[in-house]
């Protein structure tokens, strides 16, 4: 995602305060924050990405746990958003292969299909609710709260990448 505001949210309110670092992602999606490792949360707002047809699409807000070491790389994706909302999903996503929950889902070197299935399910549900003239979720806050509900629903599933689990989690997460 390029052009996204990336916030190191210390107090969890999703709003930048004077003591919170913020940066903007560049054309490759990279960003730099001047923040010590800690118990804060990464939150994005705005930005765009190219879909599979090369069309520019507005990005959804996402989040990720703070890096645990200084200078660490942290991806911010639908997968990290699930883990930020429900840390118990780390183990389930890691079991799906590759870099697990912190996978770069846009990597040209590939990502395990099971991880992509989960990421795409989350993204498709969120896009369906957030785009178009009849969008149900219009604020970043409402979108992030819905991501939290989806994370809790995914955490209740045994095999989170199966068709049945994806359907059950997305249905339960929207109730």
Predicted regions and their residues:
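Feature for extracytoplasmic/surface-facing segments of secreted or surface-associated proteins
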Residues: 1-175
